Amino acid sequence: MPASFLASLRAWIASSTIGQRILLALALGLLLITARVISKSKGTMPPGPRGLPLLGNIFQLPKLPWYRFTEWKEEFGPIFSLNFAGTPVVVLNSHEVVGDLLERKSTIYSDRPRFIMAGEILTGGMLIVFTGYGKVWRKLRRAGQEGLNVRASEKYQPLQESEARLLTTNMLREPAEWDAHLQRAAASSIASAVYAWPPLTKSDDGLVHRIDELMRRLVMAGLPGRYLVEIFPIMKHLPTWMAKWKREGLEWHRRDTEMFEGFYDNVARFMASGKYKPSLTAGLIERQEKNGLSKKEVSWLAGTMIGAGAETTAASLSVFMLAMTLYPDVMRKAQAEIDALVGRERMPTFADRPHLPYVCALVKEVLRWRPVGPVGVPRRTSEDDWYKGYFIPKGTLVIANVWAMNRDPAIYPDYDEFRPDRFLDASGNEIDIAGTHGQGHVTYGFGRRICIGMHVANQALFIDIAALLWAFNIEAPTGPDGTPILPSRTDFVDEGLVFRPAAFRCKVTPRIDDVATMLATLEKNA
């Protein structure tokens, strides 16, 4: 996010008038002077790198800023401060600091910076990830948790098992298109959980594509500096005939609301007929009055789960494919565990999950090794705070460096290696890592903003990964001399919503000759 701010700022400067540049400089100067006066009068912020006058540290951040954050951690410690054009920023880099602030002081550290375009105009204040810490956020969060907690997530398991069978069948038919199959499976699985839709037949399904485009639009709108209204909030009150950006944003909100409410109406009709399967939306409708939610709020809460959930799950499955290509010994060990329990007459199911500790550890390692959200969405302090002698003023942006915490050598020795055994003791029992909410990593976030869909996501990753390991070998292609052509360990791309491996080649081959017949039989008997 900060790196995109740099690109946005450069583009705006290049296209702005001299008067606009002078106005921006004056505003930034006033903000910086005010921030310094207030900060120095109350205490000293954590140390950090020296920046430029007015602009601070924004030009010191590369395209993938978590790498630079991790370097600064070594220089300045687990908590350091930055200046983004007058806005104070604090970056948290250790489990201890995150636990002290985002967990134990969550009432101060659970708010969001104001996203006028993304959080107010485009979404009407109903996108939970951008919603400020207040009454609306609490009721959306409570309703979402009721439909996605550990117990509630179990009712989606039959749908997820069906999706895993379809993923395996599609992978068998077109192994070279494995990435497209992963994207289809991720989108279809979350759509089934949210709306009880039948399996999607292609990765670019029209409805899911519309939701994906909405999520990308929101991510772009949330980038600092993307819209001038974020710097001058009074511009939000301009009439639409004077502000094209506002007019277009409101029109997008109208269209997206119409789409989501249409999905809501379809579920409501099936519920009225008595012919419906369990889904997140059905549960939200059943508890709508109790939770004090409007039709529009339920529609947006459900609809936006698809975009966020599909992208992150597909990216994590891509990380799994990369890891298996690079670490064949890990793949073979997981396959041996599956074979010993499941055999070749059936696919793994959720009933096998408690008896597949190494596969479960492998899922954790996928999420730790290359987190698809290395820093997440910034938070904002809602009041002044002091921590270990440092002053953190109200309105400070707070960034949790998930990348650094998942690679803390004190917790994860040889952190750059893909090693599921790190989550198991000598007897094969799960090791609890403090401060991770039983996950073994911090990829799902912290405190009151921890990902509410993590249980559904963990289920989807487990059943898809177990099915793929049961059916296939995933290997590096070989050159003319038979030498494996290994993909890059570090070539990743930031797609706005997720951080995922750059396109790479791998070879997907069936582990047994009659797997197609077995899959057809399993699907027929399901």
UniProtKB/Swiss-Prot annotation:
Residues that coordinate or bind heme: 451
Family: Belongs to the cytochrome P450 family.
Subcellular location: Membrane
CDD domains documented for this protein: CYP64-like (cd11065)
Topology within the bilayer: Multi-pass membrane protein
Lineage of source species: Eukaryota, Fungi, Dikarya, Basidiomycota, Agaricomycotina
Protein name: Cytochrome P450 monooxygenase 253
Gene Ontology terms, MF aspect: heme binding; iron ion binding; monooxygenase activity; oxidoreductase activity, acting on paired donors, with incorporation or reduction of molecular oxygen
EC number(s) on file: 1.-.-.-
Statement: the UniProt record of this protein carries the keyword DNA-binding: no
